[in-house]
């Protein structure tokens, strides 16, 4: 299986996404109880704009138990894909949990902001995106306006909470 996973990664790296997708699906079907095979299929479906297909592989991986080292990428991919297929409440739940579990990873807040926007929660989305931008910015990012932006972010977050 390791050789097959390496071959899928190689195909993706050289842009042969359809071939990688076909191999990943075959691998997941041949190894339904292997979380690595399910993850490979989920990610390959996502890369081929087959988000609805990806969901069943994400679900299978979740049930099998995603290894700790794989959880950040899994949670981001799963949460984003749920949003893309219109399951925004589930997306928000997963991404909110990811923000709590990985507070130093600004990408989770950015994807959570997209999910909040998709759910029509614009104030929360802007507050979350602003938080992500402030978190990811270099120390001198936003210059003398950093404190003002941080205050606006707090005000928006408070407004969204009420």
Predicted region positions:
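Short coil turns that delineate tetratricopeptide repeat
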Residues: 32, 66-69, 103, 137
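TPR-repeat structural position
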Residues: 17-18, 51, 88, 122
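Alpha-helical adaptor scaffolds
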Residues: 39-101
């Amino acid at each position: 299986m390791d050789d097959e996973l390496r071959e899928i990664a190689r195909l993706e790296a050289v842009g042969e996404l359809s071939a990688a997708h076909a191999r990943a699906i075959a691998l997941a079907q041949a190894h339904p109880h292997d979380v690595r095979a399910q993850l490979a299929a989920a990610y390959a479906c996502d890369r081929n704009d087959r988000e609805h297909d990806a969901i069943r592989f994400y679900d299978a991986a979740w049930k099998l138990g995603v290894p700790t080292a794989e959880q950040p990428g899994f949670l981001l991919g799963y949460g984003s894909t749920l949003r893309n297929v219109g399951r925004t409440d589930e997306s928000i739940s997963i991404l909110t949990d990811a923000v709590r579990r990985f507070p130093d990873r600004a990408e989770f807040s950015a994807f959570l902001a997209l999910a909040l926007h998709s759910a029509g929660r614009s104030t929360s989305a802007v507050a979350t995106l602003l938080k992500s931008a402030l978190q990811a910015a270099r120390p001198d990012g936003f210059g003398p306006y950093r404190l003002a932006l941080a205050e606006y972010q707090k005000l928006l977050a408070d407004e969204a909470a009420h």
